[in-house]
Amino acid sequence: MLAKRIIPCLDVRDGQVVKGVQFRNHEIIGDIVPLAKRYADEGADELVFYDITASSDGRVVDKSWVARVAEVIDIPFCVAGGIRSIDDAAKILSFGADKISINSPALADPTLITRLADRFGVQCIVVGIDTWFDDATGKYHVNQYTGDENRTRVTQWETLDWVQVVQQRGAGEIVLNMMNQDGVRNGYDLTQLKKVRDVCRVPLIASGGAGTMEHFLEAFRDADVDGALAASVFHKQIINIGELKAYLAGQGVEIRIC
């Protein structure tokens, strides 16, 4: 059995790490490179960086900080933000990123997933899915351009359908960003995760809702996710990664101990 992964998420805007609640009202957390080094030193298995306004601004992630991060950490990291072409992805990977993640550009052009997977290998291609539960319809819908609340829109896709499409297109991993839970720290949406797990054949990463160590345990034990991504509990030092991993190991979760 592959070890489960603990993945801090760093949302980047204007060259700094920020964090919001339900993708809104972002506050500045700090500088990118020191935070990345801190999480690597604490025992994170990998890091994810989202340039949250790149797609809505029509630009690609700023590559300068990607190179600086690569110089100070020795764990894998993934970068997302406005990647629309093989050339965009190649440049980010050349600066030291191990994976690239696409989200809104994949919704605009699903063939992008296949082209990137064919060029760089499926193990390098992550698809992020921003999913919102609509109380009125009782369904989960995929949202696009979520980094800019003035441009965020609900797409035609129901989440489970889009999960299956991106796998067919060549996604090597899926990060499920559960918007209702984002930053609230009330736990991951286990109901949704279980539904997605049933149709997801590639590694599945849960994102949105972690507030306690027990929430991570529930995601691994009850929804069988491959990794758990979190931000605010790490940024605000509510949970220490080393202590979290020791707790999970004590609960029988297969995990890499620092």
UniProtKB/Swiss-Prot annotation:
GO MF term list: imidazoleglycerol-phosphate synthase activity; lyase activity
Transmembrane intervals: none
SUPFAM superfamilies from the UniProt entry: Ribulose-phoshate binding barrel
Annotated Gene Ontology cellular component terms: cytoplasm
Presence of keyword Ribosomal protein: no
Any one biological process term the GO annotation gives: L-histidine biosynthetic process
Active site location: D11, D130
Primary site of residence: cytoplasm
Keyword Nucleotide-binding on entry: no
Keywords, in A-Z order: Amino-acid biosynthesis, Cytoplasm, Histidine biosynthesis, Lyase
Database matches in Gene3D superfamilies: Aldolase class I (3.20.20.70)
Enzyme Commission number(s): 4.3.2.10
Reactions it catalyzes: 5-[(5-phospho-1-deoxy-D-ribulos-1-ylimino)methylamino]-1-(5-phospho-beta-D-ribosyl)imidazole-4-carboxamide + L-glutamine = D-erythro-1-(imidazol-4-yl)glycerol 3-phosphate + 5-amino-1-(5-phospho-beta-D-ribosyl)imidazole-4-carboxamide + L-glutamate + H(+)
Recorded metabolic or biological pathway in which this protein acts: Amino-acid biosynthesis; L-histidine biosynthesis; L-histidine from 5-phospho-alpha-D-ribose 1-diphosphate: step 5/9
Subcellular locations according to the entry: Cytoplasm
Top-level enzyme category: lyase
Disulfide bridges in this chain: none
PANTHER family noted in UniProt: IMIDAZOLE GLYCEROL PHOSPHATE SYNTHASE HISHF, IMIDAZOLE GLYCEROL PHOSPHATE SYNTHASE SUBUNIT HISF/H IGP SYNTHASE SUBUNIT HISF/H
Family, per entry: Belongs to the HisA/HisF family.
Protein role: IGPS catalyzes the conversion of PRFAR and glutamine to IGP, AICAR and glutamate. The HisF subunit catalyzes the cyclization activity that produces IGP and AICAR from PRFAR using the ammonia provided by the HisH subunit.
Quaternary structure and partners: Heterodimer of HisH and HisF.
Identification of the protein by name: Imidazole glycerol phosphate synthase subunit HisF
